[in-house]
Amino acid sequence: GYIYIEGVKNMPVYLFSVDGKLLHFAENVNGSYSIPAENGVHLIKIGNTSYKIINF
């Protein structure tokens, strides 16, 4: 599946597994962005804000 992000304005985006492993990084994301990701629980950091998400 994918994780979709919208409304980001020139911010870094990090995707982590729940055990802290960096799965994806993108610099200066602007507008809409999608990240391929397996189903399950992930942590995503956009700029200085972190979110816990479930991808299914």
Name the predicted role of every residue range.
Residues 1-56:
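C-terminal outer-membrane/trafficking sorting elements
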